[in-house]
Every structure is written in structure tokens, then in C-alpha cells.
């Protein structure tokens, strides 16, 4: 609808390439009429200063006070995670009161996988001269230093979160509204979704600018789980004529949301918009120089001015993607963040990710169909074909079904049923993202963020999500649990897929090799052993060996490259496993030297049985991408390849 972005409703309500056109009307959040007789708390701002192992916590309380209401005091109580209390009482002067806490042994807040997430309870009471409480405020505070490092380095200008002095490799996904009818979203639903993120080893999440500012409980849960929040302001894929009335409206919007959210430990940065700098720079969407000037005013003057006044310790980024603003090459691979879509929209192969050393990838993705049970929720049996009217209406990206089938033709034999097509599409999605994330983690330091588009759906639909509308994990979410693991072993293989753009070409002179890498995203050195084997389809071993592994904290190490060019292309595969010093399995995987559709798989003779809470699966041969269908909506502890071994799935 023309002008819909000026309504300050979620842009995606008016249709997106994963969501329906279902705009709402009216006020959808609670409205309160507050009255007071003497004074009330108008605003509270908490500032942190970290120095030499201590933290100074300054609480500034601004009061709204009737002229003749007398003297008021503010009592601030800080309760540590262990229950210890500190109290400071301050008398207001000219409508302001300040309380300061100095913590000599602070418990610091860390992102998921880097440490704990201790939260301090800060309680503020406004008391009159008789000690009667007139107003109150209660929040959870995490103690941390958090910014974005943009230091110059050998690759250009880095872009990474730095938390308590530690540079973090961001791993996560982009969050869109959880329901097209946003009043249906509940704290329990959001908690389940975000817990699924933490369970898959996410440490970050991007709130995309085409939706809405989530409720307080969203950020409370992120604080508890250690999920760093990249927070877009709510502008996406549009331009504006900046009138005085619109400027006044959006400025009030900025102030309201910054004040509401700034105390959260998980809030990592504010970002001006989604993809608008990039497309305005390309001359798209804009119809006049005035609109281009208004863009600069909105995102490089108005928002920074609000943040300087309301949240001066926050990091602001003008757009995503961006290299720093002012239309200066927003997709520069040597600085800032990028959205990379040549895999999928550009139809380039998965291996193309390996050609790029971005600094921070805030969007890249691949579509798949939702789980079969989800498809059954909106189709009759006669509709269960991806080109049926109903199925096409649940695919909002017009050319996407064709793209899925294009990539399918490169990798797999044509599925014999819709259920197998769903399975194959989810494997394609998961493996595409695996190529990208594993590559960028192998180049930690140059790249410091891999954020997948997208996390979730707002209705039952074919999309880029890793969790569908009903909360069912697609294959991608299981893969994310593996390739976002704190310690990751991965393999850069060379074979047909990496050397031939046409997988049907004869592979004369083909290089076949395996190059293992171990990425350690923990705060401790990792020591262990990498075991490898070259195997036949029945899982029998042709060659095997091992490498001793030592990986410093927060780094990635390459192991020696191995050449297998003299072995068969279609009947050998390479498997690998990482063990710690105690012999415990840390990670594993396998690679082929050809497209899976051409590999000469043997019957693995799969067998599965249930024992207590475990599903035990055995295989006598190589079984790749085994899916367990439990007959109920359950999340399994693992889904994996089998090499002729026992696998336990809880």
C-alpha cells in the first residue's frame, strides 16, 4: 500500500517475501492513564563505568513533581545474584536524584558460551518526607562493557562485538515477528523460541527493521540467555519525505524505545534501518535529491542526536548493510557488515561462500519448505504439491520454488514424494548455511559474525526460517547447533562441487583433498586429537590417521591438507572426528568429493529402537543426513551422519 511505511506499523504487515498482507488497525498494546498527587518517576538511566576490575553503577532518576509537593527522596537497592544488598538513599534536587554503587568484585555478564549471565536486581523507590512510597521501578541489570570494535587490521577495518574486552564471533539469526497477528505472541512462545536459539549455540540475534520493537519480555529473556541483540530501528526497504510532523512522530518513537530498552545487558547496538542505505546509494526507491537528503537527516543526524542524549554509551550503526554511512560503498567486504545473497538470489553454488572474506555477515540465507506436519495444517490431501494453488499461496517469494528445484537438481536425485522433497529442501538449506558459516569461522579474525537469515516464521510458509511457525526445528536448526558449537571441527574439501560449475561435466584432472580446521570460540586453549578416515560406501576404511590438535582460545587453526586425488570420486568419502584430551567426542562430520546424487551409496541397513528416553540408531554402512521422525513434536539432541556406529538421540 502506498505510504504504508509512514503509518509506523510493522512494514511486513503489508506483505513481504515470507509473510502475508494482514495489516492490523488500532492500538494493540496496553494503554494506561496515570495520575499522581505529588511526584512520580519520569525516567531512570543507569550508567556503568568499568575500571581495574571494579564497576561503578550510577543511577540517575528524573522526577516529575508538582510545584508545592515538598521534598522527596530516592532509595535505590541493588541486589547481587547471590542475594547481597546495597542501598543508597539520595534526596532529589531540582527534579533529579543520583545514586552510585561501587562494586569491588563484580559478577560480569557474558554472551552465551563465553561465561555466565548473572543479573543484579535494581529497585528504585520514590519516597515522600514521611517515608511513604509514591512510585517504584524495578529492573534486572547485567554488568558488562559492550561496544563494536572497528580497529584497522591487515584485512581493512574490523567489525565485531567486544564484550568485557573480549572480541566475540557473533553467531545467530535474524528475528522477524513471531505471528502475523502480533497480539497472539505470548511470553511463553517467545521464551521457547529464544531457548531454542541458545540450545543451538546462538550468542546473538538481530531484530530486523521491518517488524516492530519487541515487548520487554523478549529482552529480559535475551538477558537471561546471553543473546546479544542487534536492534534495528523500525525502517526497512523504503524512503521517506521528512515532514515536520513525521520527524516529531519518529523522534518520540526513538526516545520512547531507547528509554525502554537501554538498561538491558543484551542490547549490543542500535542500527538505523534495513537495506535502505544500500538501495538509496544505488538510486533505487528514491525519486528526488530531497529524499536522499532526508535519509541522511534521519539516520545520520536525528537518531544519533537522540542516542547521544538518551543512551550515550550505546554503539550506533547507520544501516545494515553499511560501511559506516553516507552512502560510502555500503557492501564493502573489507569493513562494516554485508548482506550476501548471490547464493540463492544469484543462483551461485554453495561453494561460492568460500570466495568471500567478509568482516561481518548480517544476512545470508536459503529457503526450504516447512515440516510436513506444518504443510498438513494448511492443505487438504489434494493440495499437497508445491505447485498447487494453496502451496503457492504459502510461498511469498515468487521464484523461490524454482530456485529450490534448481539447487536440488545440482545436489540430489529427484524426490519421489512431497515428504522427500521437503526433506531434500531442508537438507539443501542446512548444507548451504553450513558452507558459509564453517568457512567464515575458519577465518576468525577476518570475519567476526555469521548471522543467518532467518530464525522464525510469522505463519505457516516456505521460507528461509530454521524454525517454522509451529516451533518445529527444520534441518537447519540442528545443523546450526553443530556449526555454531563453541569448538568446531570442519573440513574444506576440494572435489567436483568446488571445481566444476556444471556437476555433470566429466571430472578429468580433478583435485580431491581434505583440509581440516578447528575453530575454538571458548576462553580456554583446546587440546585434543583429530581422527580422520577415508572410507568406502559400506564404511570400511581405506586409510586412517590422526592429528594432535592445539588451538589457542578465540582462534582457528588449520591442520595439514591431505590429497586423495588418486582415489575414486564417486565411491570414497572422508570422515573426521574431534576428541578432547579425555577422549570425549567434541565434533564430527563427513564430506563427499562429488554431488550426493552421484555418490554410490550402499544400503546402510539402518536399525532404530527406543530405550528409556533414548532413540538408538545403528548402521552397518555410511548413512548420510539421517532424520529421525518420532511421531510427535519433539526436539532431538542430535541428528547426524552415521559411519557404521551406534548413535544415541535423546
Report each predicted region and the residues it spans:
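Generic detector of well-ordered alpha-helical packing
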Residues: 18, 30, 173, 232-233, ...
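Extracellular/periplasmic catalytic domains that process cell-envelope and extracellular macromolecules
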Residues: 162-163, 260-264, 310, 352-355, ...
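Active-site-adjacent substrate/metal-binding segments within catalytic domains
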Residues: 7-8, 34-39, 43-45, 133-238, ...
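Active/binding-pocket-proximal capping segment
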Residues: 224-227, 235-236, 456, 533-536, ...
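Flexible loop/turn segments at secondary-structure boundaries
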Residues: 23, 149, 177-180, 212-215, ...
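Substrate-binding clefts and catalytic carboxylate motifs of secreted carbohydrate-active enzymes
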Residues: 19-26, 39, 270, 305-308, ...
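Secreted/periplasmic carbohydrate-active enzymes, especially glycoside hydrolases
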Residues: 1-204, 334, 442-443, 447, ...
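Active-site neighborhood of glycoside hydrolase catalytic domains
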Residues: 224, 241-327
Amino acid at each position: 500500500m502506498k505510504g504504508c511505511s509512514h503509518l509506523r506499523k510493522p512494514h511486513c504487515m503489508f506483505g513481504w517475501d515470507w509473510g502475508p498482507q494482514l495489516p492490523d488497525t488500532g492500538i494493540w498494546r496496553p494503554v494506561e492513564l496515570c495520575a499522581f498527587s505529588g511526584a512520580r518517576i519520569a525516567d531512570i538511566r543507569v550508567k556503568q563505568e568499568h575500571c581495574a576490575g571494579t564497576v561503578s553503577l550510577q543511577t540517575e532518576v528524573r522526577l516529575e513533581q508538582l510545584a508545592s509537593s515538598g521534598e522527596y527522596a530516592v532509595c535505590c537497592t541493588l541486589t547481587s545474584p547471590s542475594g547481597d544488598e546495597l542501598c543508597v538513599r539520595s534526596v532529589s534536587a531540582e527534579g533529579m536524584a543520583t545514586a552510585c554503587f561501587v562494586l569491588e568484585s563484580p559478577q560480569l555478564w557474558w554472551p552465551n558460551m563465553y561465561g555466565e549471565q548473572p543479573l543484579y536486581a535494581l529497585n528504585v523507590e520514590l519516597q515522600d518526607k514521611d517515608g511513604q512510597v509514591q512510585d517504584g521501578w524495578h529492573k534486572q541489570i547485567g554488568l558488562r562493557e559492550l561496544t563494536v570494535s572497528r580497529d584497522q587490521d591487515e584485512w581493512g577495518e574490523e567489525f565485531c562485538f567486544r564484550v568485557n574486552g573480549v572480541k566475540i564471533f557473533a553467531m545467530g539469526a535474524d528475528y522477524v515477528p513471531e505471528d502475523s497477528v502480533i497480539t497472539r505472541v505470548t511470553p511463553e512462545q517467545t521464551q521457547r523460541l529464544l531457548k531454542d536459539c541458545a540450545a543451538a549455540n546462538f550468542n546473538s540475534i538481530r531484530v530486523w527493521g521491518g517488524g516492530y520493537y519487541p515487548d520487554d519480555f523478549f529482552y529480559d529473556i535475551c538477558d537471561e540467555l546471553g543473546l546479544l541483540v542487534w536492534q534495528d530501528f523500525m525502517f526497512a526497504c523504503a524512503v521517506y519525505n521528512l515532514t515536520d510532523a513525521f520527524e516529531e512522530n519518529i523522534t518520540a518513537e526513538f526516545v520512547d524505545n531507547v528509554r525502554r530498552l537501554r538498561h538491558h545487558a543484551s542490547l549490543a547496538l542500535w542500527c538505523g534501518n534495513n537495506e535502505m542505505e544500500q538501495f538509496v546509494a544505488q538510486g533505487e526507491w528514491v525519486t528526488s535529491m530531497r529524499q536522499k537528503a532526508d535519509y541522511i537527516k534521519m539516520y545520520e543526524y536525528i537518531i544519533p542526536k537522540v542516542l547521544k542524549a538518551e543512551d550515550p554509551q550505546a554503539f550506533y550503526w547507520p544501516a545494515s548493510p553499511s560501511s559506516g554511512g553516507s552512502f560510502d560503498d555500503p557492501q564493502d567486504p573489507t569493513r562494516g557488515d554485508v548482506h550476501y545473497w548471490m547464493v540463492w538470489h544469484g543462483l551461485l553454488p554453495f561453494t561460492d561462500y568460500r570466495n568471500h572474506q567478509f568482516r561481518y555477515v548480517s544476512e545470508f540465507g536459503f529457503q526450504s519448505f516447512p515440516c510436513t506436519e506444518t504443510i498438513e495444517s494448511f492443505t487438504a490431501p489434494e493440495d499437497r504439491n508445491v505447485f498447487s494453488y494453496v502451496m503457492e499461496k504459502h510461498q511469498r517469494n515468487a521464484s523461490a520454488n524454482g530456485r529450490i528445484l534448481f539447487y536440488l537438481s545440482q545436489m540430489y536425485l529427484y524426490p519421489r514424494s512431497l515428504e522427500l522433497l521437503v526433506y531434500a529442501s531442508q537438507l539443501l538449506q542446512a548444507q548451504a548455511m553450513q558452507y558459509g558459516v564453517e568457512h567464515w569461522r575458519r577465518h576468525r579474525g577476518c570475519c567476526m559474525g555469521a548471522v543467518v537469515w532467518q530464525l522464525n516464521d510469522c505463519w505457516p510458509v516456505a521460507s528461509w526460517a530454521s524454525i517454522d511457525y509451529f516451533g518445529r526445528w527444520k534441518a537447519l536448526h540442528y545443523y546450526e547447533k553443530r556449526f555454531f558449537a563453541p569448538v568446531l571441527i570442519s573440513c574444506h574439501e576440494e572435489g567436483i562441487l568446488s571445481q566444476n560449475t556444471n556437476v555433470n561435466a566429466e571430472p578429468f584432472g580433478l583435485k580431491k583433498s581434505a583440509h581440516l580446521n578447528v575453530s575454538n570460540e571458548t576462553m580456554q586453549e583446546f587440546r585434543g586429537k583429530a581422527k580422520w578416515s577415508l572410507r568406502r560406501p559400506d564404511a570400511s576404511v581405506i586409510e586412517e590417521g590422526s592429528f594432535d590438535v592445539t588451538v589457542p582460545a578465540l582462534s582457528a587453526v588449520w591442520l595439514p591438507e591431505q590429497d586423495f586425488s588418486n582415489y575414486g570420486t564417486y565411491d570414497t568419502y572422508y570422515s573426521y572426528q574431534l576428541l578432547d584430551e579425555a577422549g570425549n567426542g567434541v565434533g564430527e562430520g563427513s564430506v563427499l568429493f562429488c554431488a550426493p546424487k552421484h555418490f554410490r551409496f550402499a544400503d546402510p541397513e539402518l536399525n532404530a529402537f527406543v530405550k528409556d528416553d533414548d532413540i538408538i540408531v545403528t548402521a552397518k554402512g555410511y548413512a548420510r543426513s539421517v532424520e529421525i521422525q518420532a511421531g510427535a513434536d519433539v526436539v532431538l539432541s542430535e541428528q547426524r551422519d552415521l559411519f557404521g556406529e551406534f548413535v544415541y538421540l535423546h
